[in-house]
Amino acid sequence: MRHPVVMGNWKLNGSKEMVVDLLNGLNAELEGVTGVDVAVAPPALFVDLAERTLTEAGSAIILGAQNTDLNNSGAFTGDMSPAMLKEFGATHIIIGHSERREYHAESDEFVAKKFAFLKENGLTPVLCIGESDAQNEAGETMAVCARQLDAVINTQGVEALEGAIIAYEPIWAIGTGKAATAEDAQRIHAQIRAHIAEKSEAVAKNVVIQYGGSVKPENAAAYFAQPDIDGALVGGAALDAKSFAAIAKAAAEAKA
């Protein structure tokens, strides 16, 4: 049975004070909550502080990060390696986010190489896929998602998805306040799972597929009630302890 994962992507937000306050607030809000894995991905500069804060609290919250490089060392100014992230306890690494694809021109092939390097280093890739508003209107949603998935599957084999997380994030719903309905999200999640099942039913059955795109406490339960939605990759709501904890609790309750 798939175990739900709710992950907060803090994006380019935070301060030293905010990191400590938010994580301590989350620990308090999540006390006694079981049945869901909760992860946070702070900006790279705050991964160290986040690790120390979580360790001091004896927290079960999983530490992640928002990006990685294709190298573990060398002359790559401004980059950070899987080995460095691993040293600071970060295990769940977001790759392929639409903001990276757009603002940093990261191609499907480049994202697939990051995926492979994370797996090689024993880390968990959180692979973001999803379509733009124009692609959605043109009926190309699944074609885009399949292309982004196949960049990994066709180079590394479908088994590479074992232990990884897929996050379906329709670009038109990220930070816009617009969100796919629970039924529409379920339809796409089922198609994503079916696409993987064409290569391996076992991998498809077990892979965690999150939904991302304006997930809030008010709509989280409706998403998690769907059979193929295994959690959420949360943006704005992850910056508030009560809101993010409410989403995690909704996942735990729905998937119990």
Curated annotation (Swiss-Prot):
User: Which residues does substrate bind?
Assistant: 9-11, 175, 214, 235-236
Gene Ontology CC, one term = cytosol
Q: Which GO terms describe its biological process?
A: gluconeogenesis; glyceraldehyde-3-phosphate biosynthetic process; glycerol catabolic process; glycolytic process
Q: What is its EC number?
A: 5.3.1.1
Annotated compartments:
Cytoplasm
Q: How does activity depend on temperature?
A: Optimum temperature is 15 degrees Celsius.
Q: Which Pfam families match?
A: TIM
The molecular function GO annotations come to: triose-phosphate isomerase activity
Effect caused by changing residue 238 to S: Reduces catalytic efficiency and affinity, but increases thermal stability
Per the record, the domain of life is Bacteria
Q: Which residues form the active site?
A: 97 (electrophile), 169 (proton acceptor)
The UniProt keyword set, sorted, is: Cytoplasm, Gluconeogenesis, Glycolysis, Isomerase
- Catalysed transformations (reactions): D-glyceraldehyde 3-phosphate = dihydroxyacetone phosphate
What is said about its interaction partners and assembly? Answer: Homodimer.
Q: What family is this protein classified in?
A: Belongs to the triosephosphate isomerase family.
Q: Which NCBIfam families match?
A: tim
Instruction: Describe the task this protein carries out.
Output: Involved in the gluconeogenesis. Catalyzes stereospecifically the conversion of dihydroxyacetone phosphate (DHAP) to D-glyceraldehyde-3-phosphate (G3P).
This protein is called Triosephosphate isomerase
From which source organism is this entry?
A: Moritella marina (Vibrio marinus)
